Amino acid sequence: MEPAVGGPGPLIVNNKQPQPPPPPPPAAAQPPPGAPRAAAGLLPGGKAREFNRNQRKDSEGYSESPDLEFEYADTDKWAAELSELYSYTEGPEFLMNRKCFEEDFRIHVTDKKWTELDTNQHRTHAMRLLDGLEVTAREKRLKVARAILYVAQGTFGECSSEAEVQSWMRYNIFLLLEVGTFNALVELLNMEIDNSAACSSAVRKPAISLADSTDLRVLLNIMYLIVETVHQECEGDKAEWRTMRQTFRAELGSPLYNNEPFAIMLFGMVTKFCSGHAPHFPMKKVLLLLWKTVLCTLGGFEELQSMKAEKRSILGLPPLPEDSIKVIRNMRAASPPASASDLIEQQQKRGRREHKALIKQDNLDAFNERDPYKADDSREEEEENDDDNSLEGETFPLERDEVMPPPLQHPQTDRLTCPKGLPWAPKVREKDIEMFLESSRSKFIGYTLGSDTNTVVGLPRPIHESIKTLKQHKYTSIAEVQAQMEEEYLRSPLSGGEEEVEQVPAETLYQGLLPSLPQYMIALLKILLAAAPTSKAKTDSINILADVLPEEMPTTVLQSMKLGVDVNRHKEVIVKAISAVLLLLLKHFKLNHVYQFEYMAQHLVFANCIPLILKFFNQNIMSYITAKNSISVLDYPHCVVHELPELTAESLEAGDSNQFCWRNLFSCINLLRILNKLTKWKHSRTMMLVVFKSAPILKRALKVKQAMMQLYVLKLLKVQTKYLGRQWRKSNMKTMSAIYQKVRHRLNDDWAYGNDLDARPWDFQAEECALRANIERFNARRYDRAHSNPDFLPVDNCLQSVLGQRVDLPEDFQMNYDLWLEREVFSKPISWEELLQ
């Protein structure tokens, strides 16, 4: 008797009767490689329905999509980073810059082009342009600034290809840097920031457009091009360029600009914009320049990894168990399971192709929980692992005694198996070993020894072996060492001696940020909220479109479409810059000192960063990552080299041919990493993830088939699984399996169950207050010299040296000195007897 095709009803399989061979399946019925095979038809009715229901629960919102060929890096390709600086509305200004340069150039050089001059002539003209920035007339100064911008843009009017433009850009920018252009631009930028007339005019305007920020945009464009180009290293760079790069990086991170690093000036612009005092500031350009400045001065992720390894060796810690960047790059994305409807559809298409057999339920569970995602190259390995109990070597983990047809022969490339071994080495904290020993002692001996991790007297042999294994995988982080050292300094301030604080760029930047760090974090999150695609336009929200909206709004449908693409792209670039800045600062501060990181992280949490990021992901994340908000023919440098074709609605809708949008995927990964940084080892913040119902939001993000993004989503799901209840864990077994496969294991972490000691009532306030007290003590000890304990300060007992000290009095006090004497000295009665006693 034949089973009903595709139906989940009762199945009767007669294994005694010979079955006719199944007809060859149609080509369309083949499932894509990696898709789970439809097994629902092999079950009795009730179990099939239950299986389908569980499938639907676990894979709600999943769909089969191709792996995204995305490689995470500090930045996108150089050309892409250059093009994102300019909005499409700024297009006509390229020709204005060229015109300003050529008018000035023809006065001094009549018979040659810029590209035909020698190095000395280039340097002479660059210095002449630099002198022109010092004129008082605003219009003349703007023309000279535009001419310098044209030089920084690669004098594209004399180039025939994009590669030639980029080559001349590098040459021209190092030339401009050599003659001191950047410092002159910083002074001009400072002047524009303090330009109260422009600020008050912008505040009064009902609608701010591109024209209100012309001067600022030109200056920021040149500075961005200098920072971005100098930061990019090329193999063909001259030796003097490499030296200039190192010098420039050191200067950019030093407190040379108003006694603070250049990044602090840009942070000040961000807060001034958010406070409403300067609504005309071109925020996208400010944020892009801020990101590249932080990246250039502090270093990128690979540099951070080498700094981390170096710091561990200085502190006497063992090397890192693996290079996390390399591990993540070698990971493959997990295939999301097909939904129940997909399974039924595949089964109907397959028809009577396969013999049916009854399968044990526990084997089917094992089958469903598997997540094959790595191609295996040899059949021999698979055969060797057949009698292993693990699921690694078997394509289908089914019992040998079941009646099964021979497997279909697939091409070698289509065969999928699990990877051999887990990607990460497990880690154990000192605290975990202490807790394990404490529970073992109280269980077997009846008393505890506190933090003693060496005494194992009276404990059974298996416990000895467990402790040995735990100690083999013990990992001490730099943060733990720094926290212990800080406790020691506070416990014994005299015997501990003076702390030697190395003035690395991260330390200098933190000292500059410290007085106003909460305001900076709130300002960045305000702009992030305004730029998020999920945020609704509100009257009280800040206007981040000042540097993209033209003076005259579009009148045709085509112009409106172009502006719509431009506005969306503008918002995406802002999200990209803010997410990158926050992540870089968190990572560098954590390496420099854990309490610097905790201070910044706590202010992000207090400013509602966690719900803001969850709100960002509460959208169709797949459509955000594949959004086509770009017009490639209008991107720089393509638009200045080639003739612009006539734009049509079809060409605007088509966008580029890329499988995904690099900047959007980069932003999503950064935001997930920030969320991980904020919640890691923080029980109270993990509970915020649970309270804000983040699990379904994060699970939807697993649709994106990109290994790095999936890893950080799974990490966030892992920390909250113990609080989500047994039913959630039961109906999300595939997600649990993916966590097991991809996320690092803590050997005695009970993450998959609800019986952990940490699953205690939520006391957010106590945990955060204790952390805040530690941070305040650290900041007061290291940076707040005014509030130092007077008992520990040196005392000068010499009368002559005390009277000989010069005291700087403010000017207004000196002018009104007589008045002060009259009020504070002569008019007040003095009891000389009491004073002399």
Swiss-Prot record:
Region feature (Required for STRIPAK core complex formation): 796-837
Keyword Heme (UniProt): no
Biased composition (Pro residues): 18-35
Positions carrying N-acetylmethionine: M1
Subunit description: Part of the core of STRIPAK complexes composed of PP2A catalytic and scaffolding subunits, the striatins (PP2A regulatory subunits), the striatin-associated proteins MOB4, STRIP1 and STRIP2, PDCD10 and members of the STE20 kinases, such as STK24 and STK26. The STRIPAK complex can be extended by adapter proteins such as SLMAP:SIKE1, CTTNBP2 or CTTNBP2NL. Interacts with CDC42BPB. Interacts with CTTNBP2NL.
Family statement: Belongs to the STRIP family.
Name this protein carries in UniProt: Striatin-interacting protein 1
Organism lineage string: Eukaryota, Metazoa, Chordata, Craniata, Vertebrata
